A protein has these predicted regions:
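Residue-level marker of regulatory loop/turn positions in helix-turn-helix DNA-binding domains and
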Residues: 54, 104, 205
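Alpha-helical transmembrane spans of integral membrane proteins, capturing the lipid-embedded, hydrophobic core
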Residues: 27-39, 64-72, 102-110, 114, ...
Length: 245
């Protein structure tokens, strides 16, 4: 990971000329990493978790670390198979301009996603009620406290944006874009990103958030801006719940 002070003066997305993993291979590696980390190890951790903790902060952290580890192994395997270094294959670099992702993430959380739900709530008020949308996050915040709150913030604001952007933008969006074109890859990866969270009520918002993160990659060809945007998006949501819950 590096901070590069230079700029992309040509205005051409680097993803269009950077190496990528073949889409079928990318999906196979993701599937293996997600299944082993999320289903196998995650299931074991959940089964062994204490009744008091339930799906609280400690269990969430352990499950997240297990899932992230397996996904990172999948990314490392992709690098070995393509004989390309990690930074180059997934576009992992940062520039100072990527800090624009901070206000973009905030705006996406407080304006863009809520606007998406307005027509959905008008048509299906009970399904897309705000309490249903916030249910999972509120449960996590309620289970935290003291040092567990710090741990929750690290998981949500640091770990999740870094690993998820590497996987869903660095691996899958770049691979899908090589096969389907930049716009096709953007939409496919964004919808996929919403689906894998396995909460239908959150699918529209997460897919739109994925579009925002993906556009940052598409515009820069690097993950720096998308990671910062994702972190800002998550931070806005979690701190709002911590302050107003």
């Amino acid at each position: 990971m590096s901070i590069d002070a230079s700029s992309n003066s040509a205005g051409v997305s680097l993803s269009e000329r950077s190496p990528s993993v073949p889409l079928g291979q990318a999906l196979a590696l993701w599937s293996l990493g997600w299944s082993v980390g999320g289903i196998v190890f995650g299931g074991v951790i959940y089964a062994l978790s204490s009744t008091e903790d339930g799906t609280g902060t400690l269990t969430l952290t352990a499950m997240a670390v297990a899932s992230w580890t397996c996904l990172l192994v999948a990314l490392w395997t992709a690098c070995r198979m393509q004989a390309v270094d990690f930074r180059t294959l997934f576009g992992l670099s940062f520039r100072w301009i990527d800090l624009i992702g901070i206000p973009v993430g905030v705006l996406a959380q407080v304006i863009v996603v809520p606007v998406i739900y307005l027509p959905l709530r008008a048509i299906w008020p009970s399904t897309f009620d705000s309490s249903a949308l916030e249910e999972t996050a509120k449960e996590l915040v309620d289970s935290a406290g003291g040092w567990k709150t710090v741990l929750l913030v690290l998981v949500v604001v640091v770990g999740a944006p870094l690993v998820e952007e590497l996987v869903y933008r660095g691996l899958l969006q770049r691979s899908a874009s090589a096969r389907l074109g930049p716009v096709g890859g953007l939409f496919v990866a964004s919808i996929f990103f919403g689906l894998i969270h396995l909460r239908p009520v959150e699918l529209p918002g997460l897919a739109v958030a994925g579009l925002v993160f993906g556009i940052m990659l598409l515009r820069t060809g690097r993950l720096g801006a998308s990671i910062i945007t994702h972190a800002s998006f998550n931070a806005t949501g979690i701190f709002a719940l911590l302050l107003f819950n």
